[in-house]
Swiss-Prot record:
Residues 99-122 have a biased composition (Basic and acidic residues). Disulfide bonds: none annotated. Interacts with SKG6. This is Protein ZDS2. GO terms for cellular component: cellular bud neck; cellular bud tip; cytoplasm. To yeast ZDS1/NRC1/CES1.
Amino acid sequence: MVLMEDMQNKDGHNTVENSSGGTDSNNNIQMRRMRKTQLSKKELFEKRKSDVLIAAKSLDTEIQNVKNLKRLSIGSMDLVIDPELEFKVNSRNSYSSDSSKESLQESLHEENIIRSEQKEEQGSEDNDAYEEGDATNVDDSIDITQTEYLHDEETLEKEKIIRNASSSTSSSARVTSRNRRLSGVKTLAHDVVLDVENDHDSKMVDLTQNLLWVPADQHPNVKPENYLELIQDTLQNIQISTNQDIDENKLELGNNHVISNRKRTGSVVRRPSRLKTSYTKFDDEPPLADKPQEGEIQVDKRISSSDIKTIRSVSLKEITEELTKISNNAGLTDSDAVTLARSLSMSGSFTNESLHLNGNHTENDNEFASNMFNETGLTIPERSSLRRSKFNTYKIRLEGSSLPQAVKLNSLMNIQTNDNRRSASSPASYTQVPQEQASLNDFHEIFDHYRRTSTDWSTENEKYVDSTNYYSDEEDLTHASISQESSLLSTDSSNNSVLIKPHNTGSMISEKLDQHVSSSEKSNTNNSEANHGWSWLNSSNGSLNANEQTYQQLTDDEDDEECVDNEKADFVNLSVSRRAKSTKRASERINHSKNRHSPIFQIHSEEAKSVVITPSVVSSSESQPSKPTAPAVVEKKVELPTDTQASTHKKNSLEKRLAKLFKRKQHNGTCKSDVKVIKKSVKKELKKKASHSSLSKFRKSPKKKPQEAEVERPSSPTKTITTEDIDTASVIEPEVRSSNASTLLPDSHTSHSSEFVVETISELDGDDSFDISGGDVNYDVEVHSSISRDTTAGLEEDIGAEREDNTSPTAPQISTLPPRKLTFEDVVKPDYSNAPIKFTDSAFGFPLPMITNSTVIMFDHRLGINVERAIYRLSHLKLSDPGRELRQQVLLSNFMYSYLNLVNHTLYMEQVGTGDIAFNGDSALGMMDKNDSDGTILIPDI
């Protein structure tokens, strides 16, 4: 005690003892008791600080663990930004320990004054009561500081009631307990009475000043390495003050951002994120001028802890309604599978907001994290995080074109036609002797044809065959050209996503441009097939622009140097006649969502039509092997039956799409020597990656080149030709057979070219996952194995027909599912563990794995379309987190594939239910023909 008194004397408290005069011993005893009380209070205060500091350190460790778990569980909001784009967003001043020091130093100074005043006021009170009340208050502060967040509200209320009852022995103790508190902690006792003026501020309590608990919306701004320092600074500045003093300083210490955010009624989209405020901060915060209005009425009110701490929770119903509102603003009003499938993609065409939002609306709900400006002035990329590292197949369309659609289409076709004429008239394409090797070694020419669609070439050819219908149907066909001008072709007013492969003819989800199907489709079907967008093939056809006779003679010259003379005429005949059906049927056939379920053997009527054409074609090719006029005659004969049976052709061409979808191109030489030439040149071409043959073999798509296949097929029924030629004629018609053997030949004509166009999709994609045909290897084997066999054409085609009948069903059966709710029996399990994944075609422009049990289960647990879309997009964000462990990435990927299978099958079921399916005929015509475009995979419009 002597030592303690010396310490007190050093502090200057001995002046009080000397002033008392030493005569009164009772006063000395009272002063000593006060010193004891104050000293024990200081010791307790220091002990409390040390305990809290220890707790803070352990809490910091726990917070680090929670932070790591949060990264795994919810993904980082940083993933709204493209992960490959490196920049930092610092839109708010970080909550640093320096700012907390300044604010708390002010409260420290003021509370020191208050403490001295309280000591003077209560010096004459009963010291026992003072000690009891003060200890009670300290205990209350300790409990609130350390353990409030560890208990539920009922436990806290019971403890506080007990403490309040124990402190009720003295009125002064109650006054002390009511008026004194920690600066950073809100006492939540039920006997606290406040005005409504203070009520609003109490609800908007300064969360950042809480001692040990940083609010969730402040976490990103308190760096983890500085968090312990923040706690230490706060502990050093803990003081006991009165509520009145705190109320006076509310405006200085309060977090106005939190207050204004809570005052805002807002919607779900507008509510500040508890994960990261930097992406949800808006500049249109209400001014602070209306804050005094909250406290104009003076009414005593008891405040419960639940009132202060309650933050309005958002129900699933509210989220669904909010997402519905957003979708309505975006024009996605329907809740069917078509809308969902169209809107699942996070990339694609982001249309101009003024088209469906009138441009002037700046409503809260139209601001999203994905297209919002940060305070740094940097815009988060619209494309979000759907980027491929190696094969970047996504491209945002340009939106600047305001030309009418027809004008854009016509101008584009003129440009492309001029380009075609230039490339067609180039002498290199004629001077090179072999048909197969013509221009094959020109690397740039190969990639030029990648940038063109078969519809570009068919446009050119059609212009000279049927000039009256030149633009009528081409508007349907050319809007998805993969050339550099193609980005102008899609309308910005549509909400469809467009997946464009930058320099290849690839699959894309395209929007429907035209609602009409013009009658020129018939002439297109007969005249637009031969070129298929290949510049080296077009070069042989390019002379049609000047003279059709010259074109035939040039082609005959090339064929003379390769093979026998009669094959020359065959090539000439069919190169023109088979121009008919390529582009139209190929583009129609690309909608995989419908074709995957369509019947395989429903194409006999169109074959029957072709039977009428075949005899004339064959006879002309046999009797006039070298006459240049043969193509024109054949072409006219081909046109007439198609014109007479236009409606039937429409229906059957739609039905043929599935049958041709899984077929691959066959390598073809016009004779055995050509086959050897191909084999020799394949190695060179593989190295150069510049020839069609090498590309098709590389991509597991061993189909024949269309024109070469055309050369031999007409003559095959009447004479013996090369075995590869014969086998190709049978192989190229995989899925479709008619009871009439004579239909085999025209079917091979009509089917092959469309297969060619579809093949360019998977062939140029650079990804073997698109090779979804199970019979690809068999086709390749057939081509090479049949080279060694010599027999008559009719016999070989019959054998090939039987073979193909066995092979063709297997490929489409991989993806054929009944138009009903799926069951576990529909799930096809692999034959053995770790078997190669089999992919099916889909409506999304990329293949999907086979359905799994997850897809079947999801049928019974469907959410709203907007909720499902949000979940899928959030899954994209999670999956793009580079720090996520592989197992979680696999689980996410499996879920997303299962969900896409669900949407794909639901889309198919809806189309069957409404009659909008390919084999239902004309009901699908209006929906599908207007989407015609080479290299596109279509999802129907709303």
